[in-house]
């Protein structure tokens, strides 16, 4: 399944959940928080399968990755020690594009992925342009010198809050620890995703 590149607002309405994690897509004069379409306000009762699938899709769209990457990440988490659901979310959080987003270099994960693709960052001093690359504790991410005057990046640096598991000065950041489950989105029910893939 390909990556969704359409309007974020439509996806958020479908899920009844802000996939930007800010709620901004529900403002700007767009107050319709029900699902899109003619019958959007009459959201039908979902089957057990539908409930599990909706939760999976919600998280997949939130992190902006395709089905294959999502499933492969879950397979790694399923083999890890500890709670599978928590390990799964922590792996999603460890993607390079997500760390760039958490460091405040971008307003959204979609924007962060685009910045990574365009080669704006160094990982441990070397060019890094693969959004799905895993970042480990102790790794440093730095905005390249030639990118330090990009207006969209500077605007994000000025307005975004840096995640507490990251240490950062203006143009350089370091992953200092793995985030705890309580620090991640509380509207996610990862147990439903675990059940979906383990059926």
From Swiss-Prot:
**A Gene Ontology biological process annotation?**
ribosomal small subunit biogenesis
Please tell me whether the keyword Nucleotide-binding is annotated for this protein: no
Query: What Gene Ontology terms describe what this protein does at the molecular function level?
Result: rRNA binding; structural constituent of ribosome
Domain of life of the source: Bacteria
What keywords appear on the UniProt entry?
Answer: Ribonucleoprotein, Ribosomal protein, RNA-binding, rRNA-binding
Which Pfam family is an annotated match for this chain, by its short name? Answer: S4
The record's GO CC annotations read: small ribosomal subunit
Q: Which InterPro entries match?
A: Ribosomal_uS4, Ribosomal_uS4_bac-type, Ribosomal_uS4_CS, Ribosomal_uS4_N, S4_RNA-bd, S4_RNA-bd_sf
Q: Tell me, what does this protein do in biology?
A: One of the primary rRNA binding proteins, it binds directly to 16S rRNA where it nucleates assembly of the body of the 30S subunit. With S5 and S12 plays an important role in translational accuracy.
Fill in the subunit field for this protein.
Answer: Part of the 30S ribosomal subunit. Contacts protein S5. The interaction surface between S4 and S5 is involved in control of translational fidelity.
Q: What is this protein called?
A: Small ribosomal subunit protein uS4
Species source reads: Mycoplasma mobile (strain ATCC 43663 / 163K / NCTC 11711)
């Amino acid at each position: 399944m390909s990556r969704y590149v359409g309007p974020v607002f439509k996806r958020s309405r479908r899920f009844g959940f802000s996939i930007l994690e800010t709620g901004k897509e529900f403002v700007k004069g767009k107050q319709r928080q029900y699902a899109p379409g003619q019958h959007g306000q009459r959201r039908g009762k979902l089957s057990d399968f539908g409930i599990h699938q909706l939760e999976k899709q919600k998280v997949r769209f939130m992190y902006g990755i395709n089905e294959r990457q999502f499933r492969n990440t879950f397979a790694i988490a399923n083999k890890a020690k500890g709670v599978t659901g928590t390990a799964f979310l922590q792996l999603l959080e460890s993607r390079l594009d997500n760390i760039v987003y958490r460091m405040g270099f971008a307003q959204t994960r979609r924007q962060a992925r685009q910045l990574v693709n365009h080669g704006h960052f160094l990982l441990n001093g070397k060019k890094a342009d693969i959004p799905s690359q895993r970042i480990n504790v102790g790794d440093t991410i730095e905005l390249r010198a030639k990118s330090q005057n990009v207006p969209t990046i500077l605007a994000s640096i000025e307005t975004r809050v840096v995640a507490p598991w990251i240490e950062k000065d203006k143009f350089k950041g370091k992953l200092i620890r793995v985030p705890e489950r309580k620090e991640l989105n509380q509207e996610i029910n990862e147990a439903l995703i675990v059940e979906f893939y383990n059926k």
